[in-house]
């Protein structure tokens, strides 16, 4: 019996440590919604928004793409006003963990960023990516205008026609209404916390798989 209990708690600890969700000692209750870039330096760049699982992973993936200047982790797609991470974790806010991508359109276009989105996650799993499950981890390609919407719709049609994933794509196509920047400790989480169990076991391997799959879109190594 003691051995069974030991295995149970060991498994429980592993699941908790392998989850994107953490309980920080200090939580910001009301993150500020992001409408305009926070930095004058970013105002010359365009923005794109994607949700494809834990934003720690997704932020690092887009940071590696040539032409991307900055990536912000946050929340979008729901109805709860000024959500915080604790609320997001319940899966009842309607929001998904989302990244805001600032990019230079002279170096990379929206369709390429969309290709990065589909090449870096499984768009056929509903409300789940890897070990993370819940509506907050669902797949969403956001659009800012009709042109971006058309690009997303056409791209999904191409993927479906080519049967690239072998199963129906469940990615939502949504108009970006508001993006809420996540708490500060989430920003650059993978870069700043390379020894975190989730980062080592899930996030970094996911980033490396993407890099191996799409070397042509990566920034030059310094």
Language model features: what each stretch is:
Residues 7, 16-222:
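Flexible coil/turn and secondary-structure edge motifs
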Residues 1-9:
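Bacterial N-terminal signal peptides that target proteins for export
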């Amino acid at each position: 019996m003691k051995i069974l209990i030991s295995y149970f708690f060991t498994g429980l600890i592993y699941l908790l440590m392998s989850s994107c969700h953490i309980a920080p000692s200090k939580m910001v209750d009301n993150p500020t919604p992001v409408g305009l870039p926070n930095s004058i330096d970013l105002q010359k760049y365009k923005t794109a928004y994607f949700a494809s699982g834990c934003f720690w992973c997704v932020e690092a993936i887009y940071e590696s793409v040539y032409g991307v200047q900055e990536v912000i982790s946050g929340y979008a797609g729901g109805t709860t006003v000024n959500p915080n991470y604790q609320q997001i974790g319940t899966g009842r806010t309607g929001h998904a963990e989302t990244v805001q991508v600032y990019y230079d359109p002279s170096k990379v276009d929206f369709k390429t960023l969309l290709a990065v989105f589909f090449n870096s996650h499984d768009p056929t799993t509903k409300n789940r990516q890897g070990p993370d499950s819940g509506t907050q981890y669902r797949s969403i390609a956001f659009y800012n205008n009709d042109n971006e919407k058309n690009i997303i719709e056409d791209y999904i049609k191409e993927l479906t026609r080519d049967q690239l994933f072998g199963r129906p794509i469940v990615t939502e196509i949504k108009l970006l209404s508001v993006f809420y920047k996540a708490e500060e400790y989430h920003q650059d989480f993978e870069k700043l916390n390379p020894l975190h169990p989730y980062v080592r076991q899930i996030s970094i391997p996911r980033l490396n798989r993407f890099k191996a799959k799409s070397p042509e879109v990566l920034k030059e190594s310094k």
